[in-house]
Structure formats: C-alpha cells, structure tokens
Amino acid sequence: MSSRSSKEIIILGAGLVGSLFSIYLARRGYSVHIFERRADMRKENIIAGRSINLALSDRGWRGLKGAGIEDEIRKVAIPMHGRVIHNLKGEITRQPYGEKGQSIYATSRGILNCVLMTEAEKNGVVIHFNERCTGIDRKSVV
C-alpha cells in the first residue's frame, strides 16, 4: 500500500474479530487489508489452538446479522438451553441460559472464521496470509 489515504485501514489478524470488523469497515467505504501470520485455514488443515466450539448469544447474533452471515451460521449452530451442574453430593441443578424458549448456540469456531473471511473478501477486503507484523512506524500512522 504505497499511497496512504484516510480511507485505508490495516488490521492485524484474520481471526473472528479482525474478519468481522473488516466487513463493517469495508461496507463503510474503507480500503481494508488484513495481515494474518497463519496460512489460509480455508485451504490448509490448521490447528487453531482454541476451543472447537464457541457459544453465541444475542449480541453475537446481532454482529453476524449486520455482517450478512447470520442465516449461514444458524444452519450449523446447535441450541443450548441451559447447563447442568453436578455438586459433590451428587445432586443435579439445572440452570437455563435465559427465559423459557431462549438459548445460546454452539458453533464451530473454524467454520465461523472461514465464513467471516470469505464474506470479508466478498466485500473487497484483501487478506495477506503468512505475514507477520514485525514493527510499526508510529510516525506514519494516523
């Protein structure tokens, strides 16, 4: 990116947050480049080092809806209505995650990340894989 304008943004990391944020920025007219130190997980089998699933509540769904991928993720999400607690006496307590009929949803972190990166690219975001940030020139950063 040789020419700098006030509309160019660089994001370090194409994880869940970086990819989602890039979609919102691109839709607001910014030229967005993401630099990701890992290879493209959509093309290679990468061990992410994170939990396999993550739980999405209402706030997470709103973020995905704004990015236009809510319906795609709902197809693979599994509702979790509550948790069961087993105490030392062997007693069981059930705790709902919300009011009757409400749930949080388990979904694959990897699938969600792949969908977010693909949607980011559809919105013009350029993702540079296998690129590690080794420093920042603070004088040229706005």
Identify the role of each PLM range.
Residues 53:
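A conserved FAD-binding loop/helix module that cradles the flavin
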